[in-house]
Amino acid sequence: MSNIRALGAYRNALRATRVAFKTDLPVLMAARTQIKQGFVDNKDLADQEQQHEAIDKMNEVSQFLIKNIVQGEKQEGDKYFLNFHERTELGDNETIKQSKAEMGSLAGARAKKYSNIKK
């Protein structure tokens, strides 16, 4: 692998696991072990393109962990406290406002058919 880019991707991945799983030590350690194993498995890639693909994939995984993984802690009863952080990507809920027919789901397709029958 390209040493400098690979080392940067490795460090970013470790940072991402710390952000995503900081309160869950077993999951944090498992994620870091998985990342290390992935780098060990790919350390002998000879093809430059394969190296770049592996590094880019790891960078994408790191971004996904940071932006999309939120740990939750069970509170009393059936309540959970979600540990959002400043880099968590929050949706704008625009899809919730769309009708099912506009979203293109199977239910929407049936709803569209049903509305055509009614006319």
UniProtKB/Swiss-Prot annotation:
Annotated GO CC locations: mitochondrial matrix
CDD domains per record: Complex1_LYR_LYRM7
Listed InterPro entries: Complex1_LYR_LYRM7, MZM1/LYRM7
Keyword list, A-Z: Chaperone, Mitochondrion, Transit peptide
Protein's cellular compartments: Mitochondrion matrix
Gene Ontology molecular function terms on file: protein folding chaperone
GO BP, sorted A to Z: mitochondrial respiratory chain complex III assembly
UniProt entry tagged with the keyword Mitochondrion: yes
Transit peptide boundaries: 1-14
Family classification: Belongs to the complex I LYR family. MZM1 subfamily.
Protein's job: Assembly factor required for Rieske Fe-S protein RIP1 incorporation into the cytochrome b-c1 (CIII) complex. Functions as a chaperone, binding to this subunit within the mitochondrial matrix and stabilizing it prior to its translocation and insertion into the late CIII dimeric intermediate within the mitochondrial inner membrane. Modulates the mitochondrial matrix zinc pool.
Self-association state and partner proteins as the record states: Interacts with RIP1.
Name of the protein in its database record: Mitochondrial zinc maintenance protein 1, mitochondrial
UniProt source species: Debaryomyces hansenii (strain ATCC 36239 / CBS 767 / BCRC 21394 / JCM 1990 / NBRC 0083 / IGC 2968)
